[in-house]
Structures are given as C-alpha cells and as structure tokens.
C-alpha cells in the first residue's frame, strides 16, 4: 500500500518524508473572516513494517510492499500553548510524542485501553435496540436520518465520550 497525507488546506502546507522515513505534514491554519490564522500544526506518521520493504516513492509518499503486518504510529503537534499564546513548536511537540512510543502495538493498545476505560466505564446508555442494529455500520450511518436507530444514537454518544476522554488527558 501507499501512504501519504492529504489535506483540504490549499496553502500554507508542506508534505515531506523525513530522513527516518516518516511522513510529515506541516502547515498553518487559513485566515478566516479577516483574522489571520496563527495555529501551526505538524503531523508525523512512523510506519513499522514486519517483513517486506518500506520505500519512498516520491517526496511525500511511502510505499510498503510484501509486508506481513504494518503498524502506523501517528503524532500531531501544534504551536498552541494556551488561548493567548501560540509560541510552541509544532514539529518538536509531534516528535516528542512520537518518541514516547517505545512499545509494540499490543502493549500500546493494552496501555491505551487501561487508561481510557477507568473513565469510560463509569457511564452506560441504553436507548433500546431494533433490527437496524443488525446492519453494517456504514449502512446504518447512511440510513440514520430516515430510520429509527436508538442503538446508533447511544453508540455515537459513547464514541463522543471516547474521543473527549482520549483528547483531554494531561500531557497531550
């Protein structure tokens, strides 16, 4: 497979591959309603392949061939320090987060599950279940506006909680 970053931003964006064969997308938020965009971001993706090969096919695309398995580690940093200060370094923040991944996938996943479940398991929501719940998720999403799917509403509620828990932990 091939991996590269794409973005809806039309300007202020640079895609590249580092010397360590990590994908990088850096940019700055667009101006909006006459206000200059000041938040800068850098996204890094480290690809670890088990078997096969990893090679750069362009200045912004990595290709994995004949691998038994592949793990993608994604790290995103911004220059946001607080609402009055955007003096941080997006690249060094993203690099710091990526360097902290020093476990294999199974250990990283287990640590993540342990960390979020102590908050996540405090709440449950049961809005009922009907035949919609037996359909594939992509079908349920497409049909949601025209069908009654209380279990999907509960699932979205829990998904939102999961994202909030994971994105609001100390240190990142």
Residue ranges of each PLM-predicted region?
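Aromatic-residue-lined binding/catalytic grooves and analogous aromatic/hydrophobic interfacial grooves
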Residues: 1-172
